[in-house]
């Protein structure tokens, strides 16, 4: 037997629907309760409600993680949410100003910033 975990937030629900057993999540760093809510619904077999969470989390993941190589966007998001410092070590570099603005908008759209 082999256990399959999703390593891509956008594939958590699709993978779980074909037998995947969990997720190594990036967005759970900033919205752990939301990822847990979705995975709990998956485990309960309520794929209709899980799909609602998936769509919301998918937008967050897609809009955030396409800005730069991971973990730069999640680290920047966590810094914006006062969860950590914005200090990076090479080879990571800060987000460009336009991408930082896009990230702030993504976090605002999700309801994490006002």
Task: State what each model feature region is.
Residues 10-114:
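Structured C-terminal cap/extension of enzyme domains
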Residues 2-3, 65:
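Residue-level marker of alpha-helix boundaries and capping positions
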